[in-house]
Amino acid sequence: MGRLIFLSFGWLVVFLSLSGTGADFQCPSEWSAYGQHCYRAFSDLKTWEDAEKFCTEQEKAGHLVSIQSIQEANFVAQLVSGFISGSPKIYIWIGLRDRRKEQQCSSEWNDGSKVIYVNWREGESQMCQALTKWTEFHQWLNTDCAGHYPFICKSRV
């Protein structure tokens, strides 16, 4: 009996190790996986509102990217830096905008997740937020929501 339990446990360990770490999912073609999400940068130039709408209409019905940690910020920066060329002043929309209610900034990303990690450039914290090439896509800068820029969508697996 003890040997059967030992063998069963051994097979369970082998099965779990072969099945991976929980990232055994397929993102749609041209999307990149990180954690439990799929990401894709789009070169289409859209306003913040139009970019958010576009992201919600994708196959996985996502949102403009929310960034919850320095590790995720580094992943997004790497994804974007391989995608964008040209002017160092290019902006990339992310899913955060100033929704002021009595002079208080929103504490939620547009996907409803809490803002637990921030990386605003000094003096920046209003309007719509974007990454910019001159900070190597790491810091968040505010810009007019009516501007037309590329963007990154993020969707749950």
Curated annotation (Swiss-Prot):
<keyword id="KW-0732">Signal</keyword>
<keyword id="KW-1199">Hemostasis impairing toxin</keyword>
<dbReference type="GO" id="GO:0090729">
    <property type="term" value="F:toxin activity"/>
</dbReference>
<keyword id="KW-1015">Disulfide bond</keyword>
<feature type="domain" description="C-type lectin">
    <location>
        <begin position="34"/>
        <end position="154"/>
    </location>
</feature>
<feature type="disulfide bond">
    <location>
        <begin position="27"/>
        <end position="38"/>
    </location>
</feature>
<feature type="disulfide bond">
    <location>
        <begin position="128"/>
        <end position="145"/>
    </location>
</feature>
<dbReference type="InterPro" id="IPR016186">
    <property type="entry name" value="C-type_lectin-like/link_sf"/>
</dbReference>
<protein>
    <recommendedName>
        <fullName>Snaclec 3</fullName>
    </recommendedName>
</protein>
<comment type="similarity">
    <text>Belongs to the snaclec family.</text>
</comment>
<comment type="function">
    <text>Interferes with one step of hemostasis (modulation of platelet aggregation, or coagulation cascade, for example).</text>
</comment>
<dbReference type="InterPro" id="IPR016187">
    <property type="entry name" value="CTDL_fold"/>
</dbReference>
<feature type="disulfide bond">
    <location>
        <begin position="55"/>
        <end position="153"/>
    </location>
</feature>
<comment type="subunit">
    <text>Heterodimer; disulfide-linked.</text>
</comment>
<dbReference type="Pfam" id="PF00059">
    <property type="entry name" value="Lectin_C"/>
</dbReference>
<dbReference type="InterPro" id="IPR050111">
    <property type="entry name" value="C-type_lectin/snaclec_domain"/>
</dbReference>
<dbReference type="GO" id="GO:0005576">
    <property type="term" value="C:extracellular region"/>
</dbReference>
<keyword id="KW-0800">Toxin</keyword>
<dbReference type="InterPro" id="IPR001304">
    <property type="entry name" value="C-type_lectin-like"/>
</dbReference>
<feature type="signal peptide">
    <location>
        <begin position="1"/>
        <end position="23"/>
    </location>
</feature>
<keyword id="KW-0964">Secreted</keyword>
